[in-house]
């Protein structure tokens, strides 16, 4: 959930968590309780390229705050995590391509009528889907096409499974992984029209989506851009069903703010 505070996020989570018998993706396992002090791992080798210096400085301040709160801050090696963006932008568009195939104006979406059924589909999809949606459908269709499935989609899933095992092994020695939320602060609406640069802004957050691990982004510091003060965030990632650990650490930043 998107909320104004970590406390509000926890309240919403407590409402939506748990098993729903009508939802096959839900789980009855209860979240792990808080433990107070945590061992927090920082994959520093992942923070070398593409991160604005003041964003990195802000991240170091956040680490110092957590250290002062009694948490143990250690370096952790996650060599495969650098591939998360590439893997994500193969798997995710493939899923978009598959899911959006139902958007035909008959079963889903508003119909724009043409001369025949094929034109119904092309007009509806061409007129109702945005540029980014179309781009992701095309990327996904390409990755799933004959001759490229094994080269792209299948390999992406293999790397994803390797990343999952790597992170699970890391969590045997640490409790939480800490990263900046984004390598840069927010840019102006319409300022960044390059899709690749837009995708690169997700570099630190896509791994949680790929692996299904709980994560939280907390606005903690501020940086200056063109005489404007912009927030930057701290991202915390926990093992499966350890959401309470994220809220425990995050709520202390709420108090500081």
What is the predicted function of each stretch?
Residues 16, 73, 102, 111-257:
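Glycine-rich, small-residue loops and helix-cap segments
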Residues 1-58, 62, 117-123, 257:
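A short helix-breaking turn/cap at a secondary-structure junction
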Residues 24, 37-39, 43-45, 76-89, ...:
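Flexible, acidic loop-helix segments that line cofactor/substrate-binding pockets
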Residues 9, 40, 66, 100, ...:
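Residue-level signal for inorganic ion chemistry
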Residues 16, 44-48, 78-82, 93, ...:
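Glycine-rich beta-alpha junction loops
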Residues 86-99:
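Charged, often glycine-rich, active-site loop that binds/positions anionic groups
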Residues 21-27, 70-79, 168:
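Flexible, glycine/charged-enriched surface loops at secondary-structure junctions
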Residues 52-54, 85-89, 189-190, 230-233:
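Short acidic, glycine/serine/threonine-rich loops at helix termini
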